[in-house]
Amino acid sequence: VWMSALFMCLGLGYIFNFLGVFLDVFFSIFTGVPATDMNPVMDALDELTPGMVIYTCLIAPFMEEFIFRGVLLKKARRFGDRTAVVFCAVMFGLMHGNLNQCLYAVVIGLILGYVAVRTNRIFYNVLLHMAVNSFSMMLVLVENGLNVLGMSAMAAAFSVGSFIMILLLIAAGIYFFF
């Protein structure tokens, strides 16, 4: 379950992040607000500090899993596991504070909720969340590094390659999950 959940989180998270970026651009056309201003995290990713990396990859996953799957899910399970998982996933998405992150956080929250209910502990969730955030951070660091070096075409190719890899991860996750 753990490995297939990781594949599903990485794959579906990437797909829904892409959808969120598309929606940011779509709404940008109608509102006149630049798409880059709709996701405040984008500014932070351009100026990463070691503290930001540590927080994103280690501290935030622990805190978020404790709150959403450790406390909230446990309390909400009296309404049924399915309802509790969906409720916690939506709350997890909304907590991220913008449309782009909300979309993929809800999807990842559904998977993490399933794992928490299935295993009845959040230890695996913390590890999964750390792995997902670390993988995302690695993609950002590589892409930022390529752009800084003036290799925008290579950064674009890296993004396309990442997308293909993510589709393969989803397929593997579905294969092992079901």
Segments the model singles out, each with a brief description of its role:
Residues G51-F178:
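Transmembrane helix-loop-helix hairpins at the membrane interface
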Residues V1-A60, L73-R77:
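Juxtamembrane helix-loop-helix connectors linking adjacent transmembrane helices
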